[in-house]
Regions:
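Terminal alpha-helical segments
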Residues: 1-135
């Protein structure tokens, strides 16, 4: 890969820092109140946000332009087959990025889904950081 200019390098670090913060918030909230539907929804939101930001960090590093989107499937497609193939469950998080935040549109987070969301977001993190470490 081509070296990044300082601005893109800073953006890459920002994406990762923000994703790390989202994942940490999700973990803490799940530990505090996974028995509460609204808390589970917030956990799902932060997991979706974390996965989205990790993927945007990867796309930034690969110098692949991406639209303003919360669509994990689209971001995976832009990242390419090896990444998309290694994270088949990641697109499950997409509805938790927007729809879950508004009344009437929510994809329901069932008990246990918060753990699944955290696991998927963690898998995205691990995959992205492994790729970035090779560069």
């Amino acid at each position: 890969m081509q070296p990044l200019d300082p601005e893109a390098e800073s953006l890459l670090r920002d994406w990762i820092e923000k994703a790390d913060a989202d994942l940490e918030v999700a973990r803490r909230m799940a530990a505090e109140g996974a028995d509460n539907l609204r808390i589970r929804e917030i956990v799902g939101f932060h997991c979706q946000q974390a996965a989205e930001k990790y993927l945007k960090a990867l796309l930034t590093r690969c110098q692949i332009e991406f639209p303003r989107t919360h669509d994990i499937k689209l971001l995976l497609e832009l990242a390419g087959d090896p990444v998309a193939d290694s994270l088949p469950g990641a697109k499950w998080l997409t509805p938790f990025g927007v729809a879950i935040r508004y009344p009437g549109d929510a994809a329901e987070m069932l008990p246990g889904d918060e753990a699944k969301a955290i696991e998927i977001a963690s898998q995205v993190k691990d995959a992205v950081l492994a790729i970035l470490a090779r560069e």
